[in-house]
């Protein structure tokens, strides 16, 4: 018997209903901010996908050669594709360009709870504005999306420019900066201490204290003032702190200021944030930030940008008590008669035209078996139709939960009860 590939999933109808409903609620938030939906190819050139992706993700790419021997890869996330899309389609469009997307991505992960080789991302990118209000708009949209689905979460917000200012003050190489940022992202404290000690010995500097002062300060907005006092000689770090202060003035939500956020992708340049779902033991469900150099890296004009992506599957794990109401209607003809079947089809068509999902018994079951079928599918509303009901113009609607039965006027199906 064939089995699904490792790290992939099949979704049952009840799971898909839940996924589609959550997707719809998140889309509604994006639409309310007037972001426009786009889509990109599932695969792109390997050169594009690997150009500015974190080393760990680069090693997890699904790579193949097409029939023209061109090296391709399945997208591991959307931002690189969206940057390419922007350069191809929108570079001359009035700014800002506000886009959102939803689709599947692929990484050769070690499958475990909340981590799959095929997974879904939903996110947004705002390109063309370097103003603090743009960062705030993206932050607010990410937060309000999760609030719309009643998810319990915590958002941590930081700024890469704070540590960048420390690195520049001590003249660290780009390679050292990248290594330190990756160790921070992996929360490898011992590895970070060793690397910083090695740098101190090679350069005869004392950098460890400042780095850990930045990393260990967490809390509310007051953390920014405290860190300013510790970084008075670090001009670029102070600029970053002032920028973050301005952004947070425009974010009317609860958050934790955390400068230990480094993000696993190499293209972030300014404000960064991560959102953790509380149900799954603080698993990250969303991440994003500012990336002002990425468009230029892909041979476009320098364009400031900010965005984020939801890990859609992890969101699902965090709200498994999310109730999906089944509002479908099941029509049971009491006998397999052409006249009766035609009338059932007419009634079903009218109900569907008014937005109701309707199923007709297609198996010619006896009434008890048809009702058992409705119960097995958790259908709450059943219409049982005989010839007398058609002639009288009133059809019986049975509530499968309460057993209550009422007569509905065939001419008034627009006001069919929920």
Curated annotation (Swiss-Prot):
Database matches in InterPro entries: aa-tRNA-synth_II (IPR006195), aa-tRNA-synth_II/BPL/LPL (IPR045864), Anticodon-bd (IPR004154), Anticodon-bd_dom_sf (IPR036621), His-tRNA-ligase (IPR015807), HisRS-like_core (IPR041715), HisRS/HisZ (IPR004516), HisZ (IPR004517)
Keyword Heme listed: no
Compartments in which it is found: Cytoplasm
Entry keywords, A to Z: Aminoacyl-tRNA synthetase, ATP-binding, Cytoplasm, Ligase, Nucleotide-binding, Protein biosynthesis
HAMAP family: His_tRNA_synth, HisZ
Chemical reaction(s) catalysed: tRNA(His) + L-histidine + ATP = L-histidyl-tRNA(His) + AMP + diphosphate + H(+)
GO molecular function list: ATP binding; histidine-tRNA ligase activity
Family, similarity comment: Belongs to the class-II aminoacyl-tRNA synthetase family.
Documented EC number(s): 6.1.1.21
Pfam families found in the cross-reference section: HGTP_anticodon, tRNA-synt_His
One GO term (biological process): L-histidine biosynthetic process
Protein's UniProt keywords contain Nucleotide-binding: yes
Stretches assigned to coiled coil: none
Top-level taxon of origin: Archaea
Protein known as: Histidine--tRNA ligase
GO cellular component, one term: cytoplasm
EC class (word): ligase
């Amino acid at each position: 018997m064939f089995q699904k590939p490792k790290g992939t999933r099949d979704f049952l109808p009840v799971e898909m209903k839940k996924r589609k409903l959550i997707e719809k609620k998140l889309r509604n938030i994006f639409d309310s901010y007037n972001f426009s939906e786009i889509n990109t190819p599932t695969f792109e050139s390997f050169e594009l996908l690997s150009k500015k992706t974190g080393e760990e993700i680069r090693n997890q790419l699904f790579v193949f050669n097409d029939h023209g021997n061109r090296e391709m890869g399945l997208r591991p996330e959307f931002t690189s594709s969206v940057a390419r899309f922007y350069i191809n389609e929108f570079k001359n469009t009035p700014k800002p360009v506000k886009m959102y997307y939803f689709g599947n991505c692929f990484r050769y992960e070690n499958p475990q709870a909340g981590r799959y080789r095929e997974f879904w991302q939903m996110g947004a990118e705002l390109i063309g504005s370097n103003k603090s209000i743009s960062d705030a708009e993206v932050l607010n949209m990410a937060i309000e999306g999760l609030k719309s689905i009643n998810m319990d979460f915590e958002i941590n917000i930081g700024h890469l420019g704070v540590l960048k200012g420390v690195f520049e003050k001590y003249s660290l190489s780009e390679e050292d900066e990248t290594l330190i940022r990756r160790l921070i992202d992996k929360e490898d404290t011992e590895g970070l201490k060793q690397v910083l000690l090695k740098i101190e010995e090679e350069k005869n500097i004392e950098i460890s204290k400042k780095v850990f002062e930045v990393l260990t300060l967490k809390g509310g907005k007051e953390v920014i003032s405290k860190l300013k006092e510790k970084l008075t000689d670090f001009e670029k770090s102070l600029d970053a702190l002032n920028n973050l202060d301005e952004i947070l003035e425009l974010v009317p939500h609860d958050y934790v200021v955390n400068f230990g956020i480094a993000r696993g992708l190499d293209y972030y340049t300014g404000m960064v944030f991560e959102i953790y779902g509380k149900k799954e033991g603080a698993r990250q469900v969303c991440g994003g930030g500012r990336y002002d150099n990425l468009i230029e890296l892909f041979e476009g004009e320098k364009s400031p940008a900010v965005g984020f992506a939801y890990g859609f599957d992890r969101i699902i794990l965090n709200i498994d008590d999310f109730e999906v109401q089944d509002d479908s209607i099941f029509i049971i003809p009491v006998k397999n008669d052409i006249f009766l079947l035609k009338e059932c089809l007419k009634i079903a068509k009218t109900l569907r035209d008014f937005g109701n999902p309707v199923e007709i018994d297609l198996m010619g079951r006896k009434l008890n078996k048809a009702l058992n079928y409705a119960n097995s599918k958790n259908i709450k509303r059943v219409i049982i139709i005989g010839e007398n009901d058609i002639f009288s113009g009133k059809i019986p609607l049975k509530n499968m939960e309460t057993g209550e039965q009422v007569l509905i006027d065939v001419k008034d199906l627009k006001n069919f009860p929920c």
